[in-house]
């Protein structure tokens, strides 16, 4: 039945992420403390949340590629991807979904797209460093954050 085909998933871990436009500019600088945070909480696992404001789909892809190859996604348990400000844009056959999916699918963890985070309303605030339980049921998502 169609009801049994609904995507359902629950995952727990530390929330880390934000606006890709800003994060990629910190990568490799003295302000980049990502690897230390990821290692400190590796037993919890990471739930990365990413969204973009000013980047086009090609720039989003390049930024996520750079984050991936810098080792930021070690110990990842899931990715929450917000709708970018360029929602619906396609450049040379690349859309917002394949810009990230093609790079993140190798981790073998859930990649949840079009999450209500970021620069497009509606937007749900997420607290970096909180311990989260994310539940997905079809198009519905809930995020419970604990401050441990």
Where are these regions (language model features)?
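Oxyanion-binding "anion nests"
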Residues: 15-60
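Structural motif
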Residues: 13-14, 21, 46-48, 77-80, ...
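Active-site helix-to-loop segments that bind/position phosphate- or nucleotide-bearing substrates
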Residues: 13, 32-33, 66-70
